[in-house]
A protein has these predicted regions:
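Generic preference for well-ordered secondary structure
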Residues: 30, 64-67, 95-98, 137, ...
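Histidine-acidic metal/acid-base catalytic patches
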Residues: 51, 55, 77-91, 101-166
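Active-site beta-loop-alpha junctions enriched in small/polar residues
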Residues: 1, 20-22, 69-71, 96-100, ...
Length: 166
């Protein structure tokens, strides 16, 4: 509640949310291939809880923007699409271009398919040579980050024109 009030006081347009339980994003020893995944029973509980949190946030005048993220239970394009398809319309989408490309997904496709739910973006670029090395060697997310996989838009391999047109 304290964080929510701070965001409201700052006139934030939304609150970004990502499920990071058991995330491997900061672990220097666990490769991304060992990230957590949800079984069907846990998925149903997860969706129920996301919907409940989102409804509470809407009641407070602050939409929830779900952030897919490397090393978490919602990482890939398919997982992100499934999350949006499974949740109420109150759950909005944040697309992070860098994380989506890192997960071998398509930000343009997500934006087109879920434009009515898209509320926020993080424009990160990716250095392809570092991404390729990280994927080939099953690096940890932390190592890929420290190696410089992410960069500012225009300094990497993402073509932002199609994404921004959506």
């Amino acid at each position: 509640r304290k964080q929510l009030n701070l965001f409201k006081d700052c006139k934030a347009p939304c609150m970004v949310f990502a499920e990071v339980t058991d995330s491997v994003q900061g672990d220097p020893k666990v490769p991304l291939s060992k990230r957590p995944k949800l079984n069907e029973d846990v998925w149903k509980k997860f969706i129920f809880r996301i919907n409940e949190i989102s409804k509470m946030m809407i009641d407070e005048g602050m939409p929830l923007a779900y952030h897919h993220h490397m090393g978490t239970v919602i990482e890939t394009e398919n997982e992100t699409a499934r999350l949006i398809e499974s949740t109420d319309d109150s759950v909005k989408l944040l697309i992070d271009t860098g994380h989506m490309l890192f997960a071998q997904g398509n930000s343009v496709k997500l934006a087109k398919n879920f434009s009515q739910r898209l509320i926020h973006v993080h424009c990160k670029d990716i250095r392809k040579n570092i991404l390729d090395h990280s994927l080939k060697n099953d690096s940890t997310f932390r190592q890929a980050f420290l190696d410089g996989a992410f960069t500012v838009p225009g300094d990497g391999c993402i073509d932002y024109k199609p994404f921004l047109k959506v």
